[in-house]
């Protein structure tokens, strides 16, 4: 059984998503993802493409908040680390 989201989990996800979604259109593009990941360290275009392919489950070329939430729930430790930076 999956762990329940705490109010802090939800707030962290919303804050990180808004930080990554720099143009505020409600979705994260590959360039926005790449820019955000660069603040975390060196990232190659191939790594960005792989992450987009993993997170963008509907294949529309953008990460929606729902897709981001699914990824965050599956990678809670990673998201907690990222939330400390953002």
UniProtKB/Swiss-Prot annotation:
Gene3D superfamilies: EF-hand (1.10.238.10). Pfam families: EF-hand_7 (PF13499). It comes from Chenopodium album. GO terms for molecular function: calcium ion binding. Ca(2+) 2 binds at residues 56, 58, 60, 67. This is Polcalcin Che a 3. InterPro entries: EF-hand-dom_pair (IPR011992), EF_Hand_1_Ca_BS (IPR018247), EF_hand_dom (IPR002048), EF_hand_pair_protein_CML-like (IPR039647). The keyword Calcium applies. Residues 8-43, 43-78 form the EF-hand domain. It comes from the Eukaryota.
């Amino acid at each position: 059984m999956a762990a329940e989201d705490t109010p802090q989990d939800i707030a962290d996800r919303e804050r990180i998503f808004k930080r990554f979604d720099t143009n505020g259109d409600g979705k994260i593009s590959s360039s926005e993802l790449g820019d955000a990941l660069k603040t975390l360290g060196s990232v190659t275009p191939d790594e960005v493409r792989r992450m987009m392919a993993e997170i963008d489950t509907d294949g529309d070329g953008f990460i929606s908040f729902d897709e981001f939430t699914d990824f965050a729930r599956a990678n809670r430790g990673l998201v907690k680390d990222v939330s400390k930076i953002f």
